[in-house]
């Protein structure tokens, strides 16, 4: 999503832009997001809701491009959407609407898209950068690395972006899993009998408390509250679950 959107914006400003994608089609992660309906923005955006070691960047980024800017683009393409709890906006018809919108923006401004690309080398040149892909060397004055994280390798995720960053001396924070479910230990697997049951809980660790829906699965615990608390959980820490968060039984 970031690569497609960035490419369209750069081309809109007059640049000649080429996207190199290692997949057979673009936007595959978008199609998986939001359970297939793409939670494309949130009505309650603020810098305090982001985990970042540089909060000033978050403030400046959100000031320059707000949720309303993206909502306006969605409305321009006539994409129907609805608001769920906590200000989340989802497509009515499915995530493919967002992919098609981004592709239409790229096409409108003349962005070229090359698929099934295997980048083997990136280097700094006198006038910009060189990129070796599929045995061919391409040259550019500016290079944007928008490879995303390491999640979902089956959809093409690779460590290439991290490798390029390290190659050019950019400090890389060791990646760790976040927004992820928790899996049962072997001794806890009897809870799998509860698979499919969901309820509101308060999940607390040493740093944060979130109150939202939790889902029992055959492999462990999931749902919005678990995905949120996973951002703050550290290996070895305990998480306390209050199954009656709205009741004081004292």
Question: In which residue ranges do the predicted regions lie?
Answer:
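N-terminal Rossmann-like FAD-binding beta1-loop-alpha1 element of flavoenzymes
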Residues: 1-19
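Short hydrophobic core segments
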Residues: 20, 119-120, 137-154, 165-166, ...
């Amino acid at each position: 999503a970031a690569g497609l959107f960035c490419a369209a914006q750069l081309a809109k400003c007059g640049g000649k832009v080429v996207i190199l994608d290692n997949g057979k089609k673009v936007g595959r992660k978008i199609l998986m997001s939001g359970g297939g309906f793409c939670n494309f923005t949130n009505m309650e955006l603020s810098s305090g809701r982001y985990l970042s070691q540089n909060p000033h960047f978050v403030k400046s980024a959100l000031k320059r491009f707000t949720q309303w800017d993206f909502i306006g683009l969605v409305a321009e393409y006539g994409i129907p959407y609805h608001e769920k709890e906590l200000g989340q906006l989802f497509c009515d018809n499915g995530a493919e609407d967002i992919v098609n919108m981004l592709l239409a923006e790229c096409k409108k401004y003349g962005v070229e898209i090359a698929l099934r690309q295997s980048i083997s080398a990136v280097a700094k040149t006198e006038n910009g950068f060189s990129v070796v892909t599929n045995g061919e060397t391409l040259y550019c004055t500016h290079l944007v690395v928008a490879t995303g994280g390491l999640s979902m390798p089956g959809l093409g995720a690779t460590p290439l972006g991290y490798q390029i960053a390290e190659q050019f001396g950019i400090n890389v924070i060791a990646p760790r899993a976040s927004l992820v479910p928790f899996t049962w230990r072997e001794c806890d697997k009897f809870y799998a009998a509860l698979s499919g049951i969901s309820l509101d809980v308060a999940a607390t660790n040493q740093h944060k408390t979130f109150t939202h829906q939790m889902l029992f699965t055959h492999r462990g615990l999931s749902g919005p509250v678990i995905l949120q608390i996973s951002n703050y959980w550290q290996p070895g820490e305990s998480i306390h679950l209050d199954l009656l968060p709205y009741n004081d039984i004292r």
